[in-house]
Amino acid sequence: MEVKSERLFGIPFSICEIDPTLYNKNEIVDDIKSNYLKNPVRNVGNIGRSGDNVHHSYSDWDNLKYNKVKFNKLFQIYKDIIPQCINNFILNKPYNLFFCITNYCCMAEGGHISKHNHGSEDFVGIHYIQFDPKYHIQTEYVNEHPFINYQQELRPDTLSIVGDKNIYNSIYSNVWKFPIKEDEFHIAPGFLSHQVPIQPPCDKLRMTVVVNIKLKCQ
């Protein structure tokens, strides 16, 4: 007897690695670090949340106090890579793609970002341009299915049986963290809520570039 296993209402997710030699990575990292040192808690703009501990650039790009980060070469890399990632999602129609570098985030020990989503976008990309997997804690994707709040109380054995190590069973976990390497680029739907836990001590700053992505039918 043949038995098939599928996943219902699967959330698409794409991961690729961006070659750091193809763009001015060191210059970008240096500029972000310089901006961070001027103000480690640059938490302003429409997504400025008083409880967050992060240096970010959202809605503050024109602030003359900070270095203007030169993303031109990296933008061209994204222009090539993003369609390759999106096409893996098995789409139904030709589309036009629009994206923008909407933010960069930088944090040290104690840094964190509270739960949020990019609900007005089709997808969001997170590029880990500086990340130490030995110390930095990964982005957590939050399971917002309503049953998760009581599933583990009503059926406490389920999670231990299915396990919390296999992504195919992630529906039973409150949050999911992918293993992350520096230079990886992760794309997920904009509606998928995520958060950055409080970071431990590390000599290296945790840096990400955030890309908002929209698709429109041709």
PLM feature segments, named:
Residues 194, 199, 205-207:
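Extracellular and organelle-lumenal recognition/adhesion modules and their flexible linkers in secreted
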Residues 103-185, 197:
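Catalytic core of non-heme Fe(II) oxygenases with the double-stranded beta-helix
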Residues 124-127, 203-218:
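A short hydrophobic beta-strand segment most commonly corresponding to one strand
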Residues 10-12, 98, 121-123, 205-207:
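Residues at beta-strand starts and edge strands
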Residues 20-22, 129-131, 143, 213-217:
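Non-catalytic surface loops within mature trypsin-like serine protease
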